[in-house]
C-alpha cells in the first residue's frame, strides 16, 4: 500500500567548528523507513563503492583514511605532489532527479524506488542533512567519478572523504588535468568545485638540509613525511571539553555522561597521532582520564539498571 506521506520539515540551524549547517530532523516513522531502505541499499552501494572513499560508510571513518595516506607516504611512491579540492555546498546542491537516474541503473524494483521518492518528496534540489538516507545517496552519486579518477586518469593515489578530494602523483600536470576533469564531471551533475583547489609539492628536505614544500591537511589530520598531527580546531575542541570537566570537578558538580563520553571519544585522535606531548601539557594536568573512564562505566551501569527495571515493570503490567 502506497499510503505513507512524509511531513514538511522546518530546518534547524546548527553552528559547529565555525560552519553554519541547515539540518532537518526526520520523524520516527521516516527514520524507521529510511533504515529499512538503507538495509537494502547498503550491499548495493557499499559493495560497489571505491575502496578509498571514506565517511558515512560503516568501518570507513577518518582513521581508516589516515592509515591509507600514511601507507602512501611510507611507500615513498607517487607522493611528490598533492592536489586537493572540495565540492561547494555539496548536500544542498544535489538534485534528486540526477541521483534517481543513477539508481534506476542498479535498482529495478519500482516500489522500492517509489519509497525513496516519497522520502525525498520535499527535497527535489538538495539532500537534507540529518536524513540517514542522504549520506548513502550522496556517496552513491560520486561512485562513478571516483573510479574514473583512478582508472581513466591513472592517478597514483586518490582518497575522497565525502566531498573532499585528495590526490597524489609525481606528475603535477596529471594532477591539474585530474582537477579539470573533476570540475567538468561535477558540472554535469549540477555541482561546483570550490575555487580554493590547490596543487602543491609535498614537504621534503633538500640536500642542503633546508625544508621546503607543505604538509597535507585532510580529514582533520596534518600529514608530514615522518609524523601525523591533528588540526588546530580539533585540539582546541578537546582542550575546551577538558576545561569544562576540570571546572565541574573544582565546583564539586556531577560530570554529565555525554560530556565524558565525548571527551574519551576525542582522545582517540591523540592516540592515533604524534600529539602526546601536547596532551601532557594541555590535558593531563586538567583531567584524570582513568577517573573519567570509571565514571562512564559507573553511570552506564546505572542507566542500564534503570532501563532494565522499567522494562520489567512494563512486562509485569502487561
Regions found by a protein language model. Give the residues of each.
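Conserved two-metal-ion catalytic palm core of "right-hand" nucleic acid polymerases
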Residues: 1-101, 313-318
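Short acidic (Asp/Glu) and glycine-rich catalytic loops that position anionic groups and cofactors
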Residues: 15-16, 46-49, 81, 161, ...
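Right-hand nucleic-acid polymerase module
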Residues: 26, 31, 35, 119-122, ...
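Short helix-capping/linker segments at secondary-structure and domain boundaries
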Residues: 41-48, 147-149, 274-277
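Short helix-interrupting loop/turn segments at helix-coil junctions
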Residues: 43-47, 109-110, 190
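Short alpha-helical "patches" and their helix-cap loops
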Residues: 47-62, 152-162, 284-287
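Beta-rich nucleic-acid/ligand-interaction surfaces
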Residues: 55-64, 166-169, 199-208
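Conserved polymerase palm-domain catalytic core
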Residues: 67-162, 166-183, 196, 200-201, ...
Amino acid at each position: 500500500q502506497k499510503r505513507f506521506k512524509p511531513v514538511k520539515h522546518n530546518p534547524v540551524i546548527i553552528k559547529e567548528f565555525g560552519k553554519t549547517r541547515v539540518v532537518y530532523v526526520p520523524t520516527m516513522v521516516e527514520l524507521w523507513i529510511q533504515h529499512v531502505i538503507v538495509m537494502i541499499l547498503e550491499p548495493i552501494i557499499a559493495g560497489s563503492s571505491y575502496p578509498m572513499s571514506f565517511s558515512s560508510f560503516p568501518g570507513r571513518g577518518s582513521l581508516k583514511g589516515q592509515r591509507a595516506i600514511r601507507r602512501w607516504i611510507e611507500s615513498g611512491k607517487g607522493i611528490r605532489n598533492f592536489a586537493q579540492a572540495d565540492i561547494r555546498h555539496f548536500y544542498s546542491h544535489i538534485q534528486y532527479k540526477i541521483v534517481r537516474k543513477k539508481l534506476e541503473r542498479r535498482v529495478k524494483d519500482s516500489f522500492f524506488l517509489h519509497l525513496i521518492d516519497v522520502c525525498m518528496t520535499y527535497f527535489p534540489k538538495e539532500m537534507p542533512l540529518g536524513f540517514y538516507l542522504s549520506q548513502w545517496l550522496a556517496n552513491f552519486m560520486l561512485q562513478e567519478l571516483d573510479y574514473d579518477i583512478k582508472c581513466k586518469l591513472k592517478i597514483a593515489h586518490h582518497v575522497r572523504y565525502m566531498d573532499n578530494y585528495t590526490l597524489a602523483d609525481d606528475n603535477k600536470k596529471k594532477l591539474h588535468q585530474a582537477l579539470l576533469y573533476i570540475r567538468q564531471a561535477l558540472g554535469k551533475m549540477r555541482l561546483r568545485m570550490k575555487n580554493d583547489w590547490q596543487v602543491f609539492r609535498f614537504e621534503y628536505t633538500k640536500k642542503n638540509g633546508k625544508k621546503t614544500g607543505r604538509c597535507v591537511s585532510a580529514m582533520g589530520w596534518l600529514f608530514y613525511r615522518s609524523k601525523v598531527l591533528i588540526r588546530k580546531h580539533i585540539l582546541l575542541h578537546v582542550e575546551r571539553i577538558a576545561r569544562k570537566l576540570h571546572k565541574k570537578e573544582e565546583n564539586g558538580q556531577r560530570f554529565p555522561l555525554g560530556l565524558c563520553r565525548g571527551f574519551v571519544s576525542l582522545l582517540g585522535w591523540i592516540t592515533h597521532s604524534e600529539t602526546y606531548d601536547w596532551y601532557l601539557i594541555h590535558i593531563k594536568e586538567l583531567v584524570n582520564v582513568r577517573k573519567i573512564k570509571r565514571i562512564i562505566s559507573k553511570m552506564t551501569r546505572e542507566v542500564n539498571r534503570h532501563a532494565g527495571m522499567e522494562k520489567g515493570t512494563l512486562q509485569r503490567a502487561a
